């Protein structure tokens, strides 16, 4: 063969080359001639985003699946795109304007939106370039954006349809309000943080009764200015005699009643709660039951309004301090306690969220949730691992109406229109400029935009052309599998199922593959504040993208988190180098005239035992790989191909076949060996390709002009796993491995050659040793090996059992027995001490309850390794003691 590969594997050069060639040749476009289809939609990253470790894991998993199905001949569509990310993008652009001492309100709405589009076109979408660097085999010609015209058409159609059915409505309710960004956010965007706060016990004077009070506990004293009642549990005997009591609301001139409702917890505080319907969700519901009118005391920007009296204009937290000071001055604070409680924060900006009474748009979610629940219960949608179904059902059964309006400028404008002249109101899929009731042109569109997740929930079918009945929609919907982290099951997965069942009468995907998070090696979540964030681009540049991808897949346990250990990346870089160097060895021993024809019947009839063995080992690898793939066990797939390539192929077969490859045997034997070497390498590259696309494509290009990305998925060889040749090589491998272990356990230096005696009367042992004596001497570093069933074992001999008998290594003269025994005893002492420490650690309930499960598992693995090591050391000492 004329083609060769370089002396060293240079990842960056290879990666840049193939990114360009794949795109130029449109290698990732769906095959329109294929009968079967396989489709995945990428969870659309934010247009503001850059590739983080979670993206890298999620996209690597998807790419592995897509590349496998493409090689299996299916028409694969992996559809990319980005989310307009309403609040996140608007905040980014506002920060850019702030650098010029400008703010959003300095512009008209249209001018500001124009600036956001400018930013999107110039600076947004950085993540697309980074996805290409990761080697993602998506069809970039189909890239979509949630504000595309087609997707917007789908959004407005869904809104109108749900509105017409009464499933979208406008109403006044308590919502999560962010005073910093001055917009509503959904329940799912509220991040509750455990906060060390205070519980204030405030005296509410009984009206007309001097020095008589009821004590109410609260964590938010500034909201008491909006109290309209105090409430007790009707079964609380402390207060049943006070049914007609009226209270003076402290710091105001208002009186409020004492009422009774079963939602009050008798055990919390004094058993009394203040009812503030405009600033608490539970109070709002209680207020509706009790017929109370809400009183809003806060402005949208978090300052107190005119209903707060003398506190008007103060920031909410300043108002809290002033209210407390005034209560203290009036002697109305009974006590203040330290109190740890969950405080809601905006998951994007971090501002403390206010429960706030506001008129917003909502989705009546229960009827839609029922559709999603039925889809999962009936098996139309399967969660993998199955444990996530329970989480899904729990959330769906406790779901509340979804607030979908946002007080932003960037996003899908709510398609509702209001006539200023006749007050007519209508919802329309297309813009309304003339009132359909009175003909007036004084029509105003609703000022709010939709929650970003409203458009994202339509992603699986809107990106395929819906509401138009396109060929893509017919062919690729439902999609085959959704790959996602557990953190967006509620944000996104559940809503997509609802919308798919509602508008497509079919779920958007058949399987939902849930993977864990990537954490640091101590099990902590990556966080900028902690300073442990890993940049995947840095890792890819340092170790090569293939090493990084393989690491993510190989360390991903089913449904659990990955603990990021950079040292393993170094190991997988070595794996890449091993493949490269082994490939170079094979190519250097192929003549220019060599043509890889595979294992044809003509080659098959002249296969030698070592050839039969490596073909059977490939079959075993393929079987394990396919079995793991069917269960989405990526770590098992990676382990199968890693062990085959590094162990069976490189460390065993290549070493065994070298004399034949060098031409030291008959020409026919050499020819067969070279066909086996090249064909097994090509098939192994085919299995490895989904994990390591760049390296495999580069090596494969030497053998074929067809890109490996589109070559057929490897098949098994027609060789029996129990043939005599395979049995002999399995036995040879066992003997060599046993001798290597014996040498190591007894401290025999690598450069010292031993004599080996095999005590076995088995014919297979005899023929294996006789036929492979040269290989045995070379691989086990032996001076000689012989079969002697009558050999009498000496005191200084090391003995090990194998399936057909015993192997004996005479150690006399090879090692200093006393010195080696002392070394092993010191090592044993050290290992037993480490083992004892780990056992104490793993029996500590505090560690077991606080540490991440992955960290506990890692420590258990360490203990198991130490237990095995201790046994080996004891055996070695015992051997030396005779």
Curated annotation (Swiss-Prot):
Catalytic activity: tRNA(Val) + L-valine + ATP = L-valyl-tRNA(Val) + AMP + diphosphate
Molecular-function annotations in GO: aminoacyl-tRNA deacylase activity; ATP binding; valine-tRNA ligase activity
Main location: cytoplasm
Keywords linked to the UniProt accession: Aminoacyl-tRNA synthetase, ATP-binding, Coiled coil, Cytoplasm, Ligase, Nucleotide-binding, Protein biosynthesis
E.C. numbers: 6.1.1.9
Function: Catalyzes the attachment of valine to tRNA(Val). As ValRS can inadvertently accommodate and process structurally similar amino acids such as threonine, to avoid such errors, it has a 'posttransfer' editing activity that hydrolyzes mischarged Thr-tRNA(Val) in a tRNA-dependent manner.
Name used for this protein in its record: Valine--tRNA ligase
């Amino acid at each position: 063969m004329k083609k060769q590969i370089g002396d060293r594997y240079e990842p960056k050069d290879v990666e840049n080359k193939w990114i360009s060639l794949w795109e130029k040749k449109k290698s990732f476009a769906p095959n329109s001639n294929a009968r079967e289809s396989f489709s995945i939609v990428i969870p659309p990253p934010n247009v503001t985003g850059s590739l983080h470790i979670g993206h890298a894991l999620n996209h690597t998993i998807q790419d592995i699946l897509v590349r496998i199905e493409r090689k299996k001949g299916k028409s694969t569509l992996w559809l990319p795109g980005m989310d307009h990310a309403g609040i996140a993008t608007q905040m980014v652009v506002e920060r850019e304007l702030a650098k010029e001492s400008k703010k959003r309100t300095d512009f008209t709405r249209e001018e500001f939106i124009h600036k956001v589009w400018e930013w999107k076109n110039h600076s947004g979408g950085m993540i697309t370039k980074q996805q290409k660097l990761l080697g993602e085999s998506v069809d970039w010609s189909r890239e979509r954006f949630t504000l595309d015209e087609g997707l917007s058409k789908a959004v407005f159609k869904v809104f109108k349809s749900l509105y017409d059915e009464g499933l979208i409505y406008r109403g006044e309710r308590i919502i999560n309000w962010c005073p910093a960004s001055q917009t509503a956010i959904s329940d799912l965007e509220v991040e509750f943080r455990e906060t060390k706060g205070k519980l204030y016990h405030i005296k509410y004077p009984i009206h007309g009764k001097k020095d008589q009070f009821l004590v109410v506990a609260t964590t938010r004293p500034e909201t008491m200015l909006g109290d309209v009642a105090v409430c007790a549990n009707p079964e609380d005997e402390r207060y049943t005699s006070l049914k007609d009591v009226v209270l003076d609301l402290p710091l105001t001139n208002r009186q409020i009643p004492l009422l009774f409702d079963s939602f009050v917890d008798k055990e919390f505080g004094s058993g009394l709660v203040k009812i503030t319907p405009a600033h608490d969700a539970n109070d709002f519901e209680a207020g509706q039951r009790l017929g109370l009118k809400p009183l809003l005391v806060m402005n949208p920007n978090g300052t107190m309004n005119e209903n707060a009296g003398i506190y008007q204009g103060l920031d909410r937290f300043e108002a809290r301090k002033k209210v407390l000071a005034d209560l203290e001055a009036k002697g109305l604070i009974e006590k203040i306690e330290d109190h740890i409680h969950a405080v809601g924060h905006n998951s994007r900006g971090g501002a403390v969220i206010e429960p706030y009474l506001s008129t917003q748009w909502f989705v009546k979610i229960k009827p839609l949730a029922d559709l999603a629940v039925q889809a999962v219960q009936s098996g139309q949608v399967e969660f993998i691992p199955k444990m996530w179904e329970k989480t899904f059902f729990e959330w769906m059964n406790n779901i509340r109406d979804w607030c979908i309006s946002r007080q932003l400028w960037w996003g899908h404008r709510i398609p509702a229109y209001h006539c200023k002249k006749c007050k007519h109101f209508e919802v329309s899929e297309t813009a309304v400029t003339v009132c359909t009731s009175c003909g007036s042109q004084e029509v105003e569109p609703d000022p709010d935009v939709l929650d970003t997740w409203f458009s994202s929930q339509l992603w699986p079918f809107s990106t395929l052309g819906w509401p138009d009945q396109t060929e893509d929609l017919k062919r690729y919907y439902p999609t085959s599998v959704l790959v996602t982290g557990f953190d967006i099951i509620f944000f996104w997965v559940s809503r997509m199922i609802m919308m798919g069942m509602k508008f497509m009468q079919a779920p958007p995907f058949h399987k939902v593959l849930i993977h864990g998070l990537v954490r640091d090696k101590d099990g902590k979540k990556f966080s900028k504040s902690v300073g442990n964030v890993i940049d995947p681009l840095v890792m890819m540049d340092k170790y090569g993208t293939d090493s990084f991808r393989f690491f993510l897949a190989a360390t991903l346990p089913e449904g659990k988190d990955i603990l990021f250990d950079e040292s393993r990346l170094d190991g997988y870089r070595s794996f890449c180098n091993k493949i490269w160097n082994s490939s170079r060895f094979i190519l250097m021993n192929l003549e220019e005239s060599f043509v890889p024809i595979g294992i044809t019947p003509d080659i098959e009839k002249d296969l030698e035992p070592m050839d039969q063995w490596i073909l059977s080992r490939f079959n075993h690898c393929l079987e394990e790989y396919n079995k793991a793939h069917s269960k989405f066990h990526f770590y098992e797939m990676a382990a199968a191909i890693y062990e085959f390539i590094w162990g069976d192929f490189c460390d065993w077969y290549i070493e065994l076949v070298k004399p034949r490859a060098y031409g030291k045997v008959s020409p026919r034997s050499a020819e067969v060996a070279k066909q086996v070497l090249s064909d097994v390498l090509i098939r192994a590259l085919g299995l490895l390709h989904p994990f390591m696309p760049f390296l495999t494509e580069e090596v494969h290009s030497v053998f074929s002009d067809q890109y490996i990305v589109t070559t057929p998925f490897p098949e098994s060889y027609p060789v029996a796993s129990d043939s005599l040749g395979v049995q002999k090589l399995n036995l040879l491998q066992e003997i060599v491995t046993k001798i290597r272990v014996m040498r190591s356990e007894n401290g025999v230096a690598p450069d010292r050659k031993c004599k080996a005696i095999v005590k076995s009367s088995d014919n297979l042992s005899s023929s294996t040793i006789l036929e492979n004596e040269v290989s045995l001497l070379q691989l086990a570093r032996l001076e000689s090996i012989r079969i002697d069933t009558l050999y009498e074992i000496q005191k200084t001999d090391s003995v090990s059992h194998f399936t057909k008998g015993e192997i004996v290594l005479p150690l006399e003269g090879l090692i200093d027995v006393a010195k080696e025994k002392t070394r092993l005893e010191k090592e044993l002492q050290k290992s037993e001490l480490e083992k004892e420490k780990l056992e104490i650690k793993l029996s500590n309930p505090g560690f077991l309850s606080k540490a991440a499960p992955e960290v506990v598992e890692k420590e258990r693995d360490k203990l198991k390794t130490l237990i095995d090591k201790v046994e080996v050391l004891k055996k070695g000492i015992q051997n030396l003691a005779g």
